[in-house]
Amino acid sequence: MGELKPQVYKDPRPAEYFVQFHEAARKGVGWTYTLARLVLTIPTILIFRLRSIGVENVPKQGPLVLAPNHFSQMDHFFVGVYLRRKIRFMAKSQLFGPPVLTYIYKHGGVFPVRRGHHDEEAFETVHELLRQGEMLLVYAEGGRSRSRELGQPKPGIGRIALESGVPIVPVAIYGSERVRSWKRMRFPRVTIQFGEPVSFALEQAPSRERQLEVATEIFARVRVMYAELVTRSAARSGHRSPDRGRG
């Protein structure tokens, strides 16, 4: 495989265009969330032989943030299957384009973040939803890893942890690195492991360095769980454990 070229994520559309999606997310999720869950849960479990570990670590009520690693467009489905609580998702703004998908996102609890911009609106939505006692999913790496290795955490999850003080649940997703996209769909076994919640003392206006420090601490927990899942998978298949999850 050749060296991956850096991607340009800056969305040229004005911030005003995305206000509608933030307003919708703050009001609640619509019928599309329930429909997607009803239609996709059983097929997802069966096709990907999905299993979860540690789901009891996810608080049944109160504000919290799930912080998974991210390989596949299917990851949000994998994480949500075994959780009864509804999840609000932060997603890159470029996903809000095709009319049908945009409608589903708008009414399904998904709100955009304009990567490449100083997008305070996204963080305002995060904090408003947490004030409402909601559960959010924010990918610790800030986007999908384009290799089959864990990426590096971005400061965003650290900022949320410090500015909100809510529990952060680290989540390891193993197997979805072979489920790259809808266009290149494969059906490996996928395992989700939920770690114990971790909280941080409130800090006003934490520096970017401090945000990254906390993000790294959170993602270190993801790395440990991911490495354990790699080892378990190798033991089941009788193969030597690959050297993954480092960085």
Describe each region flagged by the PLM.
Residues E56, H118, Y174:
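Residue-level "edge-of-site" marker
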Residues G2-G54, K60, F78, R85, ...:
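A transmembrane-helix-recognition feature enriched in membrane-embedded lipid enzymes
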Residues M1-T32, E121-G247:
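Non-catalytic C-terminal accessory region of glycerolipid acyltransferases
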Residues V39-T41, H107-V113, A140-R144:
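Short, basic, glycine/proline-bearing loop/turn elements
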Residues S52, F89, V110-P112, I168, ...:
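Conserved beta-strand scaffold positions in the cores of enzyme catalytic domains, especially
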